[in-house]
């Protein structure tokens, strides 16, 4: 297991830093979760969803700014990836959105997409009970 406040958070921050360096877009990362242990499957799923969200924002949305937020709400982790790109009226189910849904579903979570103002990915993942640091 990994702690979101250190190991996993560092991985996500490095991912964001790498994207800032190569994409020309500005990616902002805000992790408001501390003291949670993530198993490898959770950490990997979140990493891949962030990666796919950034890729979609750049490739399809032509975004210049992307905001990634991870926070805790009740018994869930909320992951939001939002951009200032062109958005879309009709969300097509391509490989990227399909894989995001599959990864979050494997963690018993749900993901929704909104293309009305830029593009937003909202994922809600249940926290596995008892997995917090004191």
Identify the function of each model-found stretch:
Residues 1-8, 12:
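Single conserved hydrophobic/aromatic residue that forms the stacking wall/gate
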């Amino acid at each position: 297991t990994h702690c979101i406040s250190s190991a996993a958070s560092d991985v996500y921050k490095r991912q964001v830093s790498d994207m800032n360096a190569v994409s020309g877009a500005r990616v902002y990362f805000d992790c408001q979760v501390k003291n949670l242990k993530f198993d490898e499957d959770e950490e990997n799923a979140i990493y891949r969803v962030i990666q796919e969200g950034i890729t979609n924002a750049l490739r399809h949305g032509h975004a210049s700014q992307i905001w990634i937020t991870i926070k805790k709400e009740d018994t869930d982790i909320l992951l939001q990836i939002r951009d200032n790109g062109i958005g879309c009226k009709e969300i097509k189910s391509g490989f990227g959105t399909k894989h995001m849904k599959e990864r979050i579903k494997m963690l018993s979570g749900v993901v929704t997409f909104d293309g009305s103002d830029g593009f937003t990915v909202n994922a809600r993942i249940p926290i596995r009970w008892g997995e917090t640091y004191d």
